[in-house]
Amino acid sequence: MPLVRLDISHVRNLSSVRFEPSPQVNVIVGKNGSGKTSVLEAIHLLSFGRSFRSHKHKTYIQHENDACIVFAQLHQKQGSPIRVGLQRHRDGQIDVRIQGQRAQSVIELAERLPVQLINPDAFRLLEGSPSIRRQFIDWGAFHFDKDFIQAWRGWQKALKQRNTLLRRGKISLSLLAAFDQELIRLGEQVNQSRKAYVEKLTPHFVKVLSLLTTELSVSLQFFQGWDAQKNLAMAVEAGRERDIELGYTHTGPQRADLRVKTATGDALDTLSRGQQKLVVSALKIAQGQLLIDMGRPLVFLVDDLPAELDANHRQKLCQLLESLNSQIFITSVEPDTTDFTWADTTDVRQFSMTNGELSLLSKGLQES
């Protein structure tokens, strides 16, 4: 659902920012430290309940304030906009509201406001640990399969309990086997959802990458976390003695990974930084496109667009995002790096950010 209105209070240097974004393209220009990225951070916070810049909530709550607040109105095809809000307290408490009523969890916001982030740290999707790529897959599986989150939570709980049991030591194989039934059932469900999602994502990724560049041939390979020739029950049974020795569960969905390959090896090892940026951008856009094809509009956040992409690829990236008919927020230090030829029918709004103050520079459809 596109953001119709956004109110931000006490997020970093944004004491009070209120504005009505375009349902299509929003460009925010400002110097480093001006607060432009904090606008994207606030939108991300409203969707995920956490920042993409820091895991420590106290770092983004404005100094001398007890909490930060992000409020938005979300467009609906029928009826009045939905009012959603999130308040993050300095003590860590999160208060989520939808239509004025307290929500049970941030997940209810994530369902209503899917957000995709493309920023300089997106390289971590290739460079980082498998856990980052699992998060990438799980975000998609969450939106693709309505039963995924319940299975994932149950499996995580069973895995944690099993590892606690293993750390205590002196456990028999028969007791562990009895305990493993729920772990295996839920783990297989999580694995099947992940596998199905990657299969759906792959052709979208290949197509998007080809639109960004014709110079790369990249494939996606899903590793489920154990031998593909075995089911999870067989893998867990074969590994019980080793698990007892190690004191933790060494095989299963918690070891899953998304392997990004070129013809000559891992994409991380064979591609330049600029090419890696294109691959990661294609992965993110493909995820969004798949969601849009399901009738689920989402918001793209593109922070520091010029970073590591030349003007030609920046133009292609923006044209591709524009073609998805999604709401887009783009930040840049220099105005000329986002001075593209948008479609005549695209509502582009340009904002300037100075010391936490946001001002509208231009609004409306592009001139012919």
Curated annotation (Swiss-Prot):
The RecF protein is involved in DNA metabolism; it is required for DNA replication and normal SOS inducibility. RecF binds preferentially to single-stranded, linear DNA. It also seems to bind ATP. GO terms for biological process: DNA replication; DNA synthesis involved in DNA repair; double-strand break repair; SOS response. It is found in: Cytoplasm. Keywords: ATP-binding, Cytoplasm, DNA damage, DNA repair, DNA replication, DNA-binding, Nucleotide-binding, SOS response. The gene is recF. Belongs to the RecF family. ATP binds at residues 30-37. It holds the Pfam family SMC_N. InterPro entries: DNA-binding_RecF (IPR001238), DNA-binding_RecF_CS (IPR018078), P-loop_NTPase (IPR027417), RecF/RecN/SMC_N (IPR003395), RecF_2 (IPR042174). One of its GO terms (cellular component) is cytoplasm. Its main location: cytoplasm. This is DNA replication and repair protein RecF. HAMAP family: RecF (MF_00365). GO terms for molecular function: ATP binding; single-stranded DNA binding.
